[in-house]
């Protein structure tokens, strides 16, 4: 029937989630969902940080799972071969692929469009910021700042370690008169958090038009008028300088961007870089220092690092 879809499930490790998501985005995938047991474990250990807990989530296996959704067409088998080969090759890049098993199932459209939402509940990710899906209710505490988010199927929910570390760093370094640039804005979560934490002006950029659309929609949900979202890369579409540039991407992209990013940061400003697997942390630090950045602090959570550096 015309509402049937093919679901490709990749059983992997938390470390490989972003890499495998990237593999799927290189194909004709229509949606991606991620089930990370580390997110569920984080929530179980921090019961005061969130509003609701579904006990059935404790039954989720230790294995992380990435699911991609496809319409069955002539290219599907080609996509599947590419996925299997790419997942198998992750070890060559020093990424633990875990089980690395790839399975295919038939699913109904309604199942994959909505089932992922049961894993996404209001979560406190910093001293002030609570990420709340737009379909959930939440009783706000006096000191809390609520970020309304509908990530859709294509973007993270804001509970990943890398996002949490970025938000905590933004909370520490943002002042009311500051300008923030967000590289690879995705759902817009960091741009929105920056604005709600008091940034005067925020510019988010992303190469993906789907991300640009998602960011703009989420900004509307939060009733903000001081965020500008642009399609393209920072060097080509943004003018001027920021007090803070934040990039939650991957180590290789951060290393590539470092020299160019320097020209977009005000003297005394900060570069908050995350999405860095711990095994690549020293490579990023070395590049930052070679480029003239001073390392302000290094945050670590799980297998990930967030490096805050400064231009004097």
Swiss-Prot record:
It holds the Pfam family PrmA. GO terms for biological process: methylation. GO terms for cellular component: cytoplasm. S-adenosyl-L-methionine binds at residues 163, 184, 206, 248. It is an enzyme of class 2 (transferase). It is found in: Cytoplasm. PANTHER family: ELECTRON TRANSFER FLAVOPROTEIN BETA SUBUNIT LYSINE METHYLTRANSFERASE. Belongs to the methyltransferase superfamily. PrmA family. Methylates ribosomal protein L11. This is Ribosomal protein L11 methyltransferase. It comes from Clostridium botulinum (strain Langeland / NCTC 10281 / Type F).
């Amino acid at each position: 029937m015309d509402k049937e879809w093919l679901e490709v499930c990749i059983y992997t490790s938390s470390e490989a989630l972003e890499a495998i998501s990237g593999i799927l985005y290189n194909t004709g995938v229509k949606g991606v969902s991620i089930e990370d047991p580390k997110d569920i474990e984080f929530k179980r250990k921090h019961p005061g940080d969130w509003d609701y807990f579904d006990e059935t989530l404790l039954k989720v296996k230790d294995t992380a799972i990435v699911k991609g959704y496809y319409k069955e067409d002539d290219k599907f088998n080609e996509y599947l071969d590419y996925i299997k080969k790419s997942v198998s090759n992750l070890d060559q890049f020093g990424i633990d692929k875990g089980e690395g098993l790839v399975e295919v199932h038939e699913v109904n459209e309604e199942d994959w469009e909505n089932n992922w939402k049961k894993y996404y509940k209001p979560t406190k990710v910093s001293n002030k910021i609570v990420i709340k899906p737009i379909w959930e209710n939440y009783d706000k505490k006096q000191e809390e700042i609520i970020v309304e988010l509908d990530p859709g199927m294509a973007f993270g929910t804001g509970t990943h370690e890398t996002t949490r570390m970025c938000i905590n760093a933004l909370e520490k370094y943002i002042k009311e008169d500051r300008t923030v640039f967000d590289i690879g804005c995705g759902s817009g979560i960091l741009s929105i958090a920056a604005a709600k934490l008091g940034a005067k002006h925020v510019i988010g950029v992303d190469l993906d038009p789907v991300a640009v659309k998602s960011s703009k929609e989420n900004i509307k949900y939060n009733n903000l008028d001081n965020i500008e979202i642009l399609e393209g890369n920072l060097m080509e579409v943004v003018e001027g300088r920021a007090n803070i540039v934040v990039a939650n991407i991957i180590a290789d992209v951060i290393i590539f961007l470092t020299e160019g990013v320097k020209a977009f940061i005000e003297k005394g400003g900060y570069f908050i870089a995350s999405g860095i697997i711990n095994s690549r942390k020293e490579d990023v630090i070395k590049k930052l220092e070679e480029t003239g950045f001073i390392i302000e602090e290094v945050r670590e959570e799980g297998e990930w690092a967030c490096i805050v550096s400064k231009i004097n």
